Amino acid sequence: MAASTQPSPADRDRTADRSLAVELAKQSGVLLRNLGALPLHKGQKVAYIGAFADHPRYSAGHPRAPQVTSAIDAAVLHDRKIQYIEGFPADLDQRDEAEFLRAVAAAEAADAAVIFAGLPECAELAAADRRHMRLPECQNNLIARVAAVQKNTVVVLHTSGPVECPWADDVSSVLCMYLAGEGLGEATDALLWGDADPCGRLPETWPLRLEDTPCYLDFPGDGVTADYREGVYVGYRWYDARKMPVRWPFGHGLSYTGYVYRGAALDADTLTPGGTVTARVTVKNSGAMRGAEVVQLYVADATGAPVPGGRVPQALRRFAKVDLQPGEEREVVFTLTPQDISRYSPELHAWCAAPGRYEIRIGHSSRDIRAVLALQYADAKI
């Protein structure tokens, strides 16, 4: 047997590993909402509320990372003016009235309040399915109460997927960190206080409620059998096809800077079998902070041809992340082929595209399209 070329744990560069973990977590955080409370500013007195601030949930499956820094540890390291109040436990839906009122009072007296909310690990086990999409009631109640007394209320979410957020319109800002690994604490601190720009984008739609999801009518099924009857209408395709309002759409993510799109164009207005078409767009950082924009390209079938199983309104086909300094602009280029406008036909056992008109949609998210370009295709089978 050949000797392993992998370094032993003792030989690994832990400093480099940790730096990479922090950077990955920074780029994974998604700023879902921001009415101005973020970024926090030096000198502000900020109440940190919620046990996840001190005991971060950074992964699933009983992880054992060699070092995990909490948001509180990172704030102390950077000399932030914070006061920590537990408010609610991380592992139970349990309300302690005295602790609840102490958290509300601290939030009201502060310049801003950051509530670290999320699901306990027992709610997201691989061996069991979630029965609902709610946060623990003790968390929802405290968020609502704090938002009523503190206009600069920020919620940081630690979950592995979407949750219902009934308080979303009442808080100033929402930052979703998901389960961002051992670099979670430092990354959360950097994003909250503006040392880094949020550049993550949602990999899924966040619905308003469980009843809006495509699986609601079929789950949990009959015994050990669950039918997946949504067909091609998976994820954002379901919500777009029904023109349903959602909490936050697929691909969404805000920034502390701004981006302007201009000059979107195709190098040809017709795509032929075996050919390619190039889509271009120029993106400019119009703000005062370095950031990274994720440019997304969707394809919509506008041929009107009948489609067995249903036609999805649009489908993501390309995306590119572009780092930009303030005032910098860069051209983003995508190359498209007939595969990108095609669907698989079980009857023909082939990828097919109806002849006619397609729309190339370029934008910031699935529901923030900045340019629509027309493209013709002339063949029915690849």
Task: Outline where the language-model segments fall.
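C-terminal non-catalytic regions of proteins with extracellular/luminal or membrane-system context
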Residues: 1-382
